[in-house]
UniProtKB/Swiss-Prot annotation:
Protein name: P2Y purinoceptor 2
Its biological purpose: Receptor for ATP and UTP coupled to G-proteins that activate a phosphatidylinositol-calcium second messenger system.
Family indicated by similarity: Belongs to the G-protein coupled receptor 1 family.
Pfam families: 7tm_1
Length: 166
């Protein structure tokens, strides 16, 4: 957002660039993320059947519907909202950089072309790294709620586990 303001409104962005402000924003973000992730400690549990202890990847069966609701809210707050903000900011920056300067003729200056390429690369990497995981996780949780075959569940579970490290 700061970078976007720097491109779209350079003079206004000067007051947002102070280190004290950046530290406050970072602290608030960390507190929010920790608060949003704290319920995982409640949902991720173990269960005992006889002498066998099972560590649940998501939650115990009886809590799973609540876990899916929690995960959906977290998907919105911690992925969809930031992804949308990043997408909008970078698209606005690219549009501004591609716009010819007043009174100039000819092609786009090399520095602006390089900036637009960097914007495209950042968006591509962010999308490639985060979108597959969130899509497969959402599908996996949704499919687990339905009565689907083990083959289908195993296939989506494999895709989910493959995209986790991204």
């Amino acid at each position: 957002v700061h970078r976007c303001l720097g491109v779209l409104r350079p003079l206004h962005s000067l007051r947002w660039g102070r280190a004290r402000y950046a530290r406050r924003v970072a602290a608030v973000v960390w507190v929010l993320v920790l608060a949003c992730q704290a319920p995982v400690l409640y949902f991720v549990t173990t269960s005992v059947r006889g002498t066998r202890i099972t560590c649940h990847d998501t939650s115990a069966r009886e809590l799973f519907s609540h876990f899916v609701a929690y995960s959906s809210v977290m998907l919105s707050l911690l992925f969809a909202v930031p992804f949308s903000v990043i997408l909008v900011c970078y698209v606005l920056m690219a549009r501004r950089l591609l716009k010819p300067a007043y009174g100039t003729t000819g092609g786009l200056p090399r520095a602006k072309r390089k900036s637009v390429r960097t914007i495209a690369l950042v968006l591509a990497v962010f999308t490639l790294c985060f979108l597959p995981f969130h899509v497969t996780r959402t599908l996996y949780y949704s499919f687990r709620s339905l009565d689907l075959s083990c083959h289908t569940l195993n296939a989506i579970n494999m895709a989910y586990k493959i995209t986790r490290p991204l």
